[in-house]
Amino acid sequence: MKQLILVSFLIVFNTNAEDQTNIDALLDGLHEDAHKGNFEAYFDRYSLDAVFLGTDKTERWNIQEFKSYAKPAFADGHGWTYEVIERNWEGSGDTYWFDEILFNEKLGHCRGTGVVQLINNEWKIKHYALTMLIPNSIAADIGTQTQQAE
């Protein structure tokens, strides 16, 4: 019985470690493809029914809408660049969720959050949301500016 429990634990641990490696590769590749302007490779990382949320309140796109939005940014061989500072994720089986702190020269620190799912033995991004990180000390001022801009 102890051996069965140990074997079960090792299988789960190994699977989780392998999943984590594959998910990190998926997300690292996403950011690398965006940086290099690899449109097809970038969007191949998303599921066919993926949703992307951008930083503006109007930016809720299905994958086809997101492709239309992003195409001009990728047209010159450059997409956008976000450096990964830190990443956390949770989950098991065929679904994981993550959050990552990113840095962009224009927007500063941002947070990407999302859900990935194993589809036909390949990890795909089902949902991704990008938000700007605002220090609490200036949040009220930013809130006022946001309301004025609307």
Across the structure, where does each feature detected by a protein language model lie?
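A mature extracytoplasmic/lumenal domain signature
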Residues: Y46, D56, E86-N88, I101-N104, ...
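Short, well-ordered alpha-helical segments enriched in acidic and aromatic residues
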Residues: G37-D49, L53
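Surface-exposed, charged secondary-structure patches
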Residues: D19-D24, K67-H109
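A short gly/proline-enriched turn/hairpin at secondary-structure junctions
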Residues: A50-W61, P72-H78
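Low-complexity, intrinsically disordered terminal/linker segments enriched in charged
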Residues: H127-E150
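Short beta-strand segments and strand-loop junctions that repeat across beta-rich extracellular domains
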Residues: T113-E122, T146-Q148
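Sec-dependent N-terminal signal peptides
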Residues: Q3-F13
